[in-house]
């Protein structure tokens, strides 16, 4: 369900469970939700996806959510500081990695991030570090190898990781940085050149929100995500155990 639609929704009924999550979890969480619903007849899972910081801000502003799942620790730290999640329920549930991708039909002869400094490379996309976890991971990784500043003039900031993926898939940019799980969605449109060594591991935290009428099914969903069955579903979409 679109985030804007969630903002206009009345308080969820007892059998509705609202999950707000990072854009990179879209495909995997749809599958997780479907399985959870099949095991809990009558429960309807409503899903909202976007850049982690954007989704969090919507929760802070009053959007209904029973669970928040983000793509980095900084977003969840902000959620804890804003007192919109229960810190005792916070758990890391998945691991990912940042990869450099190019359009599948690219003829630039690129092999690694160092090649992005070549004159023939004009546009490189990644999430806006101010609000998008993959952008923050990318920034940290590129700073580590002294490539962040040289690439600033070529930057095309994306609002979330899926937008960055689309830019590359549509040949609108020469290269981009996305999560490995996102690149795997379009193997015929993009080609992975390199995995980036990030200073911090790419871990995904999840937590229960503290809203007054939180769904009674929220705890069960969180446990399902952490269970062997939930982890197996995530693994099918490329996520690894934390």
Each language-model region and where it sits:
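Bacterial N-terminal signal peptides
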Residues: 1-8
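Bacterial Sec-dependent signal peptides at the C-terminal "C-region" and cleavage site
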Residues: 8-14
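Exported/periplasmic ABC-transporter solute-binding proteins
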Residues: 14-40, 44-49, 53, 57-63, ...
